[in-house]
Amino acid sequence: MPDGTVNTGIGASVKRIEDQRFLTGKGNYTDDINRPDQTYAYMLRSPHAHAKIITIDSSAAQASEGVVAIFTGEDMQVGGLPCGWQIHSEDGSPMHEPPHPALAQGKVRHVGDQVAVVIATSLDHAKNAAGKINVEYEVLSPVMDMKVAEAGAPFVHEDIETNKCYDWGLGDKDAVDKALADSAHVTEIDIVNNRLIPNAMEPRAAIAEFNEATSEYTVYTTSQNPHVIRLLMGAFVLSLPEHKLRVIAPDVGG
């Protein structure tokens, strides 16, 4: 490489300058940010993979120490969570995108689906109150894998009457079929691709505050793309113009 590479940075080793504060415990993550008189949210989640919500009784939780408010899906009829990546099927039709409310409405569709949120003066108070919420479920048959999902399984989202989000592929099916038909031997094997998830040091987190004087929100959250969060939250969740919502991404632990 020519001598100019070190000066331009192209082809040269780039020295990191941010490691010292992380190695010495001086990172600034979302959980490190605290605001005056802040409250805490704790989600009550479904233990079932597929079930109807019959009733939610939060009366005992409402009377619990430190509780500020309790919300369920009935309180969030507007402002769902949009899909950030749109895909079209091979025939050009858009993918099915059923509603994705912040809290389950009438039905849970996976273990851990959010059923209620408790707002309290401390995280311990919120957790304690959530344990007092009584949810009655009608458990439904779960859809556990893709093959079962197509074989007459119950619909996870009844309003779209299918368990297939989109039909998309690559390659030449006719050429593949011909190659298999002309082969001397054909071996078939079922391969299951396991679910993958990164084990980040920091889970999803957010802290937000509202300025009554300016009617503006500020959100601190774990994100590598705060501009997209501002766009989606403003347009689809909070129905706010972007200039009324400020999203700050501090250090991200994953």
Q: Where does each model-flagged region fall?
A:
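Flexible, low-hydrophobicity surface segments
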Residues: 1-162
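ATP-dependent carbohydrate kinase catalytic cores
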Residues: 36, 241-244
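Short, surface-exposed connector motifs at secondary-structure boundaries
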Residues: 40, 109-111, 209-218, 252-253
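Predominantly extracellular/luminal regions of secreted and cell-surface proteins
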Residues: 70, 170-179
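Acidic, glycine-rich active-site loops and adjacent beta-strand->loop/helix elements
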Residues: 76, 223-226, 251-253
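Conserved beta-alpha junction segments in alpha/beta enzyme cores
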Residues: 176-238
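Beta-strand segments within the central parallel beta-sheet cores of soluble alpha/beta enzyme folds
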Residues: 243-251
